Amino acid sequence: MVRMTAVCTAKTVSPVPSTRKELKGAIAELRKKLNAVILAHYYQDPEIQDIADFIGDSLELSRRAASTNADVIVFCGVHFMAETAKILSPEKIVLLPDLEAGCSLADDCPADEFAAFRDKHPDHIVVSYINCTAAVKAQSDLICTSSNAVELVNQLPKDQPILFAPDQNLGRWVQKQSGRKLTIWPGRCMVHETFSEEALLKLKIMHPEAKVIAHPECLENLLELADYIGSTSKLLEFTEISSCTKFIVLTEPGILHQMKLKNPKKEFMDVPGIDGCSCNECPYMRLNTLEKLWSCLSTMKPSIEIEEGVRQKAFIPIQRMLNMKETQEASEH
């Protein structure tokens, strides 16, 4: 069982600074005083990205969490990311600005149901996408991210059956790219499943010179229309090295902030959700705000706590991922 608790203190909290400038200044002061590091995912609001020490995808942020010298990690993302930081750095205080910042994909894979599913396939190695709870990670043999899923699967023995969880769209894409047959848990991301194919086709007609870039959590019919598929960090990298000056982006639009900063002369368009709704934004990622970031540094809560037995079991497949990735990188040099 995983506990996510708010650790109470008797500390008196000052009023919230009244201007954005004062708020950012107060956050910077607290960060220095507490020897804290602020990690932010690409899907966070731009003003949080701008104040973060490091911005990245799940793999990059996992590495930062494992190697930081800070005493306090503030994870501006969702709770499975903060859990991962705590798993890798149990001696650190790990704060999440809003404890309600969950994940529909992680919620789609309850630990008890996953255990029953895994027990039906005892000969399979369990590869779990990092977008899952600590309790599911603890039942896994190897953790992957969308950045490294294909290459990690390719490193596994060819005769080894593989169970992949929890994202079925990513699983299908990994299966196609690797040529490996995967037994796939039927989970999905509420954001990446809501992009409108009709809206995408209209954008392609209006901007025939634009390249469509997509995250592999998208539905297969949308991936078939993409010119390039990759994780958030790889999508960002592609926009920098491509000679194309216009992109249609199929992932959570928070990434557009970094794309525009790194490519000020290029144009980026996000794809609306079905029926033109704004559901292409992750409601959980958007729960974190500068005010909540300041508050968690001021009060040192909410903090992430994980039962040590679960943490130790979850650490093994994450560390295995990091070791496999490092081994491959070393062999390429």
UniProtKB/Swiss-Prot annotation:
> Which cysteines share a disulfide bond?
none
Q: How is the cofactor bound?
A: Binds 1 [4Fe-4S] cluster per subunit.
The metabolic or biological pathway listed in the UniProt record of this protein is: Cofactor biosynthesis; NAD(+) biosynthesis; quinolinate from iminoaspartate: step 1/1
Cofactor(s) annotated in UniProt: [4Fe-4S] cluster
Q: Where in the cell is it found?
A: Cytoplasm
One Gene Ontology term, aspect cellular component? cytosol
- Pfam families (UniProt xref): NadA
- The record lists [4Fe-4S] cluster as bound by 103, 189, 282
Q: What is its EC number?
A: 2.5.1.72
> Which biological processes are named by the entry's GO terms?
'de novo' NAD biosynthetic process from L-aspartate
Q: A single Gene Ontology molecular function, please?
A: metal ion binding
**Major location, coarse class?**
cytoplasm
Q: Does the keyword DNA repair apply?
A: no
Locate the residues binding iminosuccinate: 41, 58, 129-131, 146, 215-217, 232
Q: Which InterPro entries match?
A: NadA (IPR003473), NadA_sf (IPR036094), Quinolinate_synth_type2 (IPR023066)
Domain of life the protein comes from = Bacteria
Q: Which reaction does it catalyse?
A: iminosuccinate + dihydroxyacetone phosphate = quinolinate + phosphate + 2 H2O + H(+)
Keywords assigned: 4Fe-4S, Cytoplasm, Iron, Iron-sulfur, Metal-binding, Pyridine nucleotide biosynthesis, Transferase
What the entry lists under HAMAP family is as follows: NadA_type2
What does this protein do, in the record's words?
Catalyzes the condensation of iminoaspartate with dihydroxyacetone phosphate to form quinolinate.
Concerning its family, UniProt says:
Belongs to the quinolinate synthase family. Type 2 subfamily.
Name the UniProt record assigns to this protein: Quinolinate synthase
The species this protein was found in: Prochlorococcus marinus (strain MIT 9313)
What lineage is this protein's organism placed in?
Answer: Bacteria, Bacillati, Cyanobacteriota, Cyanophyceae, Synechococcales
